[in-house]
Amino acid sequence: MTAPVRRVPDVVYGEVPGYRPLELDLYLPREDRPVPVIVLVHGGGWRHGSRRHPLPVLGADFYDRLAAQGFAVAAIDYRLSGEARFPAPLDDVRTAIGWVGEHAAGYGLDTGGIFLWGDSAGGHLALLAALTGATAHGVVAWFPVTDLARLPSDVADAGGVPDPGPGSREALLLGAPASSVPGLAREASPVSHASAAAPPVLLMHGAADDLVPPAQSIRLAEALHAAGATAELELVPGATHMWNGASDTDGIVRRSVEFLRTVTPQAGAR
């Protein structure tokens, strides 16, 4: 049995002078108890994307289906690279997490189960927030960027076409190519912040991804393991970026949900 879902759209979770209001949409299961919440961070190379557009292979009702399994979902927008440079989008994710904690009682949210979930650029931001002290009891990151400095070489090694120049996605995020601002690139890379204090992390990556190669997830998993943290890594055979080519996207979602339930056994319990 799945729970019916209530939507609360266009909630302003933050306001930064000079910028558009920062908004999220809530998807709430109708439960008689506080429910864990997933802060969902969309991808798009830090320059595109919206809280209203899940990955195409998952369908437009993905957030409703996720919430129907007993999790509240807070799908957030954040400032894109055409609006503001790093660390602006990271600051926005942190602000959204703070909003969830502050407003949990009013929406029936369990602050003992705040999870981050993101894909691609959103996975990068979710990981970075969790690894730099934001409240997170677990992270699901799908095909995330984890090491900005090595992204061009990883793309080349995977048979893709690297773009190390000033118009690249990472240069637009940082304000300059990663090679020109190595200190900032390190600060903006989740792999630089691996520590024993990290929450449990699930990394899932297409084995055939040449846009954000699996080496990015492998490297972070190794760094987290070396630091004594809990990290699980799964490479999906045949899958490229955005789960194109994956034979079982429903299975990928199930694996991700079960990970969160394992991290906090009461999370999303049906």
Which residues fall in each region the model found?
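Alpha/beta-hydrolase superfamily serine-hydrolase fold, recognizing
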Residues: 1-270
